[in-house]
Every structure is written in C-alpha cells, then in structure tokens.
C-alpha cells in the first residue's frame, strides 16, 4: 500500500498513494514496532518509499528491512542490489517477475550471479515468483537462502498480467512451501484484500512450516488500528486461542 499497488483498481492505487505520506509511513512503522513486529518489506523503486526507508533507518528505526529488488530504474540488477545493501537492508529478494522470466528461459547463470553478488555483500538473499514451478526450479539449484511465495499465481502488474486471483492457486502454493526445505515468506495470503483477514491468517499459519512467516500489506486508510488488530489476530492464532 505504501507504493500504491492495491492489486484492485487504479482508483484504489491512487487513494493509497495519497494517504501514505512519509509521516504516515513512519507512524505505521512506529506502531508496528510497538505492536511487536520486527521486520518490514518494501520495494526498492518507489521514490517516496525508498526515501522513507532511508530516513527511518538513518534515525535509528528498529525494524529490519527486507528489500524486494527490481532494476527497472537501474542499469542492471547488481547496481540495484548494491544500493539496497548500502541503504541498510538485512536481506533482499528478487521481484517475482524477474524470477519468472529466468525460470521460463532456464537461465541459471544469471540468477546464480545475482544471488552470489548479494550474498557476497553479507545479506541473506531470496527469490519471489508467481508460480510454484519457478520456486521449485530455484530450490533445485540451491542458490537462495529463502523464498517469498505468493499464495496466488496472479502474475506481475509490471508486464500487464496481474490481478488474476483464483482460490485453486492457494493449495498449490502451500504444497510448494512445504516442499521447499528453506524458510519461506508467504505473501498475498489475503488475495490483496479479497479474503477475510482472520480466515487468511488462520489458513496460512495452519499450513506453512513452523519457521515460515507471512508478509501482509496494511492500508490504514481503511482501518486506523489495522496494525494492532492484525498482530492481535496472529497472536491468538499462534497461541491456540
């Protein structure tokens, strides 16, 4: 939501962008800290978001930053990796659209070079992808430290193939996560706002591996206390309440 990617409508995108000023982004991170969240994930390309991350980390923010890396605004992926590392990411993963393309072309050399470059900088490196097959291919190469697995094979907005949400995809994503013998970040577990949050959290934590986590976007324009409410739901689920 910080970058205006609602995965719903263009009007919704614009609403999110207008709402999330730098002050509101900072407030959301501060509320996440107080609620017990320890990590945030953002992209590396939206100027307002990148600037907010820089300022937050510069002023001692306690959340760890995992960067989703793309290179549409850089000359190559190595330059994008270096910038995120210099800003202060603790880990990074490559945008699913880039990994999907490497999988289609079975381009092991390129994705291995990206992973090696990031790891040489001292950060954990992972991959996202929109189809389980791409994740299983990368996993077979044993080159990533973790996987960011989308619950829906919805495609990438950046190539005009996004917004495809089918419930049948969820089972395949979960099966993929359970086959991958490395930590996974499950994302789009609510289908970009299409699934009730409580049901989505319960379903996700009931099926992912014990060391896995979830990544959810939070648009406080819909509900100001969304951060605290989400944390409370997850605590209840994990405690068996």
Show where each model-derived region lies.
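Glycine-enriched alpha-helix->loop->beta-strand junction motifs that scaffold or abut catalytic
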Residues: 36, 58-62, 86-91, 119-121, ...
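Active-site beta->alpha loop and helix N-cap motifs at the rims of alpha/beta catalytic domains
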Residues: 10-105
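Hydrophobic faces of well-ordered beta-strands that scaffold small-molecule active sites
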Residues: 1, 39-42, 63-69, 92-94, ...
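Histidine/lysine/aspartate-rich catalytic loop segments that bind and position anionic ligands
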Residues: 136-165
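Glycine-rich phosphate-binding active-site loops on the catalytic face of alpha/beta enzymes
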Residues: 96-98, 146-156, 207-223
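Active-site-adjacent beta->alpha loops and helix N-cap segments on the catalytic face
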Residues: 44-60, 73-79, 98-114, 132-137, ...
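Structured C-terminal cap/extension of enzyme domains
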Residues: 4, 12-16, 22-30, 55-59, ...
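Surface-exposed cleft-lining segments at the edges of enzyme active sites
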Residues: 93-107, 120-124, 157-162
């Amino acid at each position: 939501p910080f970058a205006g990617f609602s995965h719903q409508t263009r009007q919704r995108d614009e609403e999110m962008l207008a709402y999330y000023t730098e002050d509101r982004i900072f407030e959301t991170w501060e509320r996440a800290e107080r609620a017990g969240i320890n990590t945030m994930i953002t992209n590396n390309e939206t100027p307002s978001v990148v600037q907010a991350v820089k300022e937050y980390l510069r002023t001692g923010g306690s959340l760890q930053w995992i960067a989703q890396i793309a290179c549409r605004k850089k000359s190559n992926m190595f330059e994008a990796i270096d910038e995120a590392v210099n800003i202060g990411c603790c880990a990074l993963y490559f945008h699913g659209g880039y990994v999907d393309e490497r999988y289609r072309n079975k381009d092991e050399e390129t994705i291995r070079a990206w992973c090696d470059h990031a790891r040489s900088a001292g950060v954990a490196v992972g991959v996202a992808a929109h189809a389980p097959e791409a994740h299983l291919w990368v996993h077979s190469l044993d080159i990533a430290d973790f996987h960011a697995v989308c619950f829906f094979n919805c495609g990438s907005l950046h190539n005009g193939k996004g917004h495809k949400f089918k419930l049948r995809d969820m089972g395949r994503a979960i099966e993929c996560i359970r086959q991958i013998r490395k930590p996974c970040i499950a994302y789009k577990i609510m289908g970009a706002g299409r699934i009730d949050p409580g049901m989505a959290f319960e379903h996700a934590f009931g099926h992912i591996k014990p060391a896995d986590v979830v990544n959810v976007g939070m648009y406080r324009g819909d509900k100001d206390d969304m951060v605290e409410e989400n944390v409370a739901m997850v605590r209840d689920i994990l405690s068996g309440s």
